[in-house]
């Protein structure tokens, strides 16, 4: 199977934006920090896995933002990072960081499992 470079992403509103691995890394790192499991490189490390997967296995050249988010969740769970995956899922739902933290704290304290 030929490897293709992922150059763009189709956003929820239908517009196409440049693919930015750094945005994925930052989102993973934020979730890792929120879950208390940030090792300083997990965002970059797993974002590169997401990019490699997309380049090798994605059927279309332009993945959607939803497909990328689902892939991030899968990779987080598959690599044994379920607490980070849970934080990432919650984080996706909130644009406001303060609202995100208010929702996340009870989950982390209560040991909620997905």
Explain the meaning of each model-derived region.
Residues 1-114:
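Extended catalytic cores of very large enzyme megasubunits
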